[in-house]
């Protein structure tokens, strides 16, 4: 299996956001605890810079909250389907995300 470079993951996140008119705010890596979020009403996500595959799939999950199915349902349904969207659109995945 070909290893996906960090830059390719970062570019993929940016391309998805651009294609879906999503603005991105980045949480500094100096902040110890990640604070990811998505705001559908303003099409904006907060993510950490794409430092590794875990950060990448988390970014895709937040994008999934904007463009994924069933984001007007219960919190559990929204979370599940944001992960489904992330998995379906990822160029690489991490076993810990399963």
Each predicted region: which residue ranges?
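A short, highly charged nucleic-acid-interacting micro-segment common to nuclease
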Residues: 1-8, 86
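A short glycine/serine-rich beta->alpha loop
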Residues: 49, 70-73
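Post-HExxH zinc-binding segment in Zn-dependent metallohydrolases
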Residues: 75-98
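Active-site scaffold of zinc-dependent metalloenzymes
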Residues: 3-6, 14-54, 66
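Active-site recognition of the HExxH zinc-binding catalytic motif
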Residues: 57-70
